[in-house]
Amino acid sequence: MKLETQYHGIIEYNENNIINLVKGMSGFENLKKFILVGIENNEVFSLFHSMEDKETAFIVSSPFYVKADYEVNLSEELVKELKIDSEKDVLIINTVNLSKDIKKMTTNLGAPIIININKHLGKQIIISDDEKMIKYPMIHS
């Protein structure tokens, strides 16, 4: 299948690529279907693109690229909501704020997107509103 996007051209995907958010992203609550697509020649960043709005996409990354000891405690409620059976089912990604100055790029460690990769369910959760976590530097000088 193909998804025509505003800024990234045509993205090919299959049903298994679709992530259904049980609640939309913060500020985009009405958008619930996304695909996670790798960016060619880039192991750090991926594209989290809405299936419902061809203009909405987020650059995302694993939090472990910038903070090896990053931890998220999942509530029992979230584990049930996302039908998580094992830690191996879980993928954690965070949105990235790009900048022309690479030293100013940040990631939002305060609001991770938790994905059950086997059930294709996800949810963005708020774990911190601390400015240091919301705008965590991608590169430390």
Curated annotation (Swiss-Prot):
<protein>
    <recommendedName>
        <fullName>Flagellar assembly factor FliW</fullName>
    </recommendedName>
</protein>
<comment type="function">
    <text>Acts as an anti-CsrA protein, binds CsrA and prevents it from repressing translation of its target genes, one of which is flagellin. Binds to flagellin and participates in the assembly of the flagellum.</text>
</comment>
<dbReference type="GO" id="GO:0006417">
    <property type="term" value="P:regulation of translation"/>
</dbReference>
<keyword id="KW-0810">Translation regulation</keyword>
<dbReference type="InterPro" id="IPR003775">
    <property type="entry name" value="Flagellar_assembly_factor_FliW"/>
</dbReference>
<dbReference type="InterPro" id="IPR024046">
    <property type="entry name" value="Flagellar_assmbl_FliW_dom_sf"/>
</dbReference>
<comment type="similarity">
    <text>Belongs to the FliW family.</text>
</comment>
<dbReference type="Pfam" id="PF02623">
    <property type="entry name" value="FliW"/>
</dbReference>
<keyword id="KW-1005">Bacterial flagellum biogenesis</keyword>
<dbReference type="GO" id="GO:0044780">
    <property type="term" value="P:bacterial-type flagellum assembly"/>
</dbReference>
<keyword id="KW-0963">Cytoplasm</keyword>
<comment type="subunit">
    <text>Interacts with translational regulator CsrA and flagellin(s).</text>
</comment>
<keyword id="KW-0143">Chaperone</keyword>
<dbReference type="GO" id="GO:0005737">
    <property type="term" value="C:cytoplasm"/>
</dbReference>
